[in-house]
């Protein structure tokens, strides 16, 4: 995967090499400017795949020959690439953490060529998985405690998107996936029921249901909308349950609907099942669902226990791009002095926050809720024993004094001097951590529409550095 990079990263690398600055230490931040779907926060994901990439980063003989064939790279540079390994430092916010615009999700400190060459894959994996985890979390929250499964692999935009997309959705809160390989590789619980083809294969719907119940008596969820949900599907399901499962003493089963007015049909189906004594039968639905459809159906009294969500989750259809960027924020002199750098733009939102930084999350001691994120220069420490005044970096007259709080650093070391120093927790723990961290956000921040803006503020020192660089750049 080393060659999964933008070509300019290689030409710039060759240029750095020729200019004699290949070993110049640089600092890059990965951050995003806008939460997808107008939401209040995003979910960080993709770190484990980034770690795997960094650990296996090297150029093969075939890669070197290809680059030589382009006649754009010096032999000295190609010789350098032949022995290439990542030797720098990487800090990152752990997967599953709610994150906000402008704060660094990943910080890379490395020689210029190394830092440049990992840009594309870093953005690819963090952007994609953070996008899907964020969308999944919205959908799971809309379901109000009901089970949500990821059903999207056949609509994903490529095999990798299906496999790691299911992983990201699991971090965001889904209970499992229909994608078998995601279970095999990442441990995302895989499951499923039947397709309409199963029902069509048999002489009639009842025979299809009876055979399935006989084959999978402890996992019998029947797809009831192949012909007519209320006139044949549900009655035939009840008959199969009565004739196959009931004699076995099995009371847990399910039906699934994949079409029609799901709010109306599930209410009718629930009554039919309850009247027949199948009160423990679960009702599942699918059919191009998203958080808004789920919300609306529940408001309309839909009787649904499980949602299977496919294309609108695995592609994040409503806003299918997570706009993470990778920007130089500092360079380091041979004596260790860090020189902050800034990117200026006519678009104010594109002006970067310079320097090697820390990100603190401030929590109220009395509520346990997140109050604000506070970005500082790397050598600053937050003293939680003293009141802290924070301010909006764009409207500095907006100020708030925080007291009785705890401060937790979000960025943790992943690689130091090229050596991995971080152990990825099991995916189930990442999922649980995500749910716990989302719980620390106020409900106002979690609104789907017009959420309360969460504070992400700069320390006085960092703000002054940014302003100084802005003024200097305009002289």
Question: Could you describe each region identified by the protein language model?
Answer:
Residues 1-27, 34-36, 72-73, 78-87, ...:
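Buried, small/hydrophobic-residue-enriched core segments of structured protein domains
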Residues 65-66, 134-138, 152, 446-453:
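Short coil/turn segments at secondary-structure boundaries
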Residues 90-98, 469, 474:
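Short histidine-centered loop motifs in beta-beta connectors
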């Amino acid at each position: 995967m080393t060659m999964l990079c933008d070509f300019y990263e290689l030409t710039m690398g060759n240029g750095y090499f020729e200019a004699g600055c290949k070993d110049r230490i640089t600092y890059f931040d990965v951050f995003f400017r806008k939460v997808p779907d107008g939401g209040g926060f995003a979910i960080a994901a993709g770190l484990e795949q980034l770690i795997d990439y960094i650990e296996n980063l090297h150029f093969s003989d075939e890669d070197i020959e290809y680059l030589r064939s382009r006649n754009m790279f010096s032999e000295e540079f190609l010789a350098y690439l032949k022995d290439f390994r990542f030797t720098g430092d990487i800090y990152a916010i752990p997967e599953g953490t709610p994150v906000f615009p402008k704060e660094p999700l990943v910080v890379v400190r490395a020689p210029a060529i190394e830092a440049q060459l990992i840009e594309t894959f870093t953005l690819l994996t963090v952007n994609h998985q953070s996008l899907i985890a964020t969308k999944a979390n919205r959908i799971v929250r809309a379901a109000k405690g009901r089970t949500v499964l990821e059903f999207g692999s056949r609509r994903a935009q490529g095999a990798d998107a299906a496999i790691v997309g299911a992983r990201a959705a699991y971090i965001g809160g889904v209970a499992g996936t229909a994608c078998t390989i995601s279970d095999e590789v990442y441990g995302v619980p895989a499951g499923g029921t039947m397709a309409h083809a199963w029902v069509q294969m048999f002489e009639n719907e009842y025979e299809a249901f009876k055979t399935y119940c006989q084959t999978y008596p402890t996992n019998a969820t029947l797809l009831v909308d192949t012909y007519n949900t209320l006139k044949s599907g549900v009655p035939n399901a009840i008959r199969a349950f009565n004739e196959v499962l009931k004699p076995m003493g099995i009371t847990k089963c399910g039906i699934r609907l994949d079409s029609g007015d799901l709010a109306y049909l599930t209410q009718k189906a629930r009554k039919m099942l309850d009247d027949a004594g199948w009160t423990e039968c679960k009702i599942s639905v699918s059919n191009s669902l998203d958080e808004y459809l789920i919300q609306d159906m529940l408001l309309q009294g839909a009787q649904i226990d499980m949602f299977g969500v496919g294309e609108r989750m695995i592609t994040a259809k409503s806003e299918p791009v997570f706009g993470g960027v990778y920007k130089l924020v500092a360079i380091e002199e041979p004596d260790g002095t860090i020189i902050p750098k800034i990117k200026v733009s006519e678009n104010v939102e594109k002006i970067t926050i310079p320097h090697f930084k820390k990100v603190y999350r401030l929590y109220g001691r009395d509520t346990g809720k997140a109050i604000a994120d506070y970005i500082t220069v790397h050598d600053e420490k937050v003293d939680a024993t003293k009141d802290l005044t924070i301010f909006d970096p764009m409207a500095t007259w907006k100020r708030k004094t925080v007291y009785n709080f705890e401060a937790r650093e979000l960025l943790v070391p992943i690689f130091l001097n090229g050596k991995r120093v971080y152990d990825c927790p099991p995916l189930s723990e990442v999922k649980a951590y995500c749910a716990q961290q989302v719980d620390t956000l106020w409900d106002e921040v979690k609104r789907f529409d017009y959420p309360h803006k969460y504070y992400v503020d700069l320390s006085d020192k960092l703000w002054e550095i940014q302003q100084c660089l802005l003024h200097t750049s305009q002289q």
